[in-house]
Amino acid sequence: MVEKRDVEREDKFNLTVDVLMLAGTLLLQSGSEIYRVEDTMIRIAHSQGIMDCNALAMPVAIFFSIENTNISRMKRITHSNYNIEKVCDVNQVSRELVSGDITLEEAFEKLAQLKKKKAPYTNKQLTLAAT
């Protein structure tokens, strides 16, 4: 029989993975360095007591797994651009979560809002600026 404590633990693990995967996705889509994506994901996991974990980021995908559990995720990155403002915003949310200033739920909500945030420049503006 599965104990309530085990279910709560797995729910927390899943929420943590949701948060760090969203953070990693936003960072990678916004042009962040690969090492920063992996480091952010690991720091978020460690802040929630998940020490035995693996994060792997590539330009086209991110992977995360927790040792000795059946929890693992993969996210394919289909488009990206350079949005340093969004990278800074995601890093700020990560810092607030790791320092304990916000909860997992608050971090997820902030990241979800950042995901909806429009790029500061349109493709047309970028093209005109480059010429």
Summary of predicted features, one role per range:
Residues 110-118:
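Cytosolic juxtamembrane amphipathic/interface segments immediately preceding
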Residues 103-111:
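Non-transmembrane, extramembrane segments of multi-pass ion/lipid transporters
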Residues 119-131:
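Core alpha-helical transmembrane segments of integral membrane proteins
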Residues 1-102:
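Soluble N-terminal domains of membrane-associated systems
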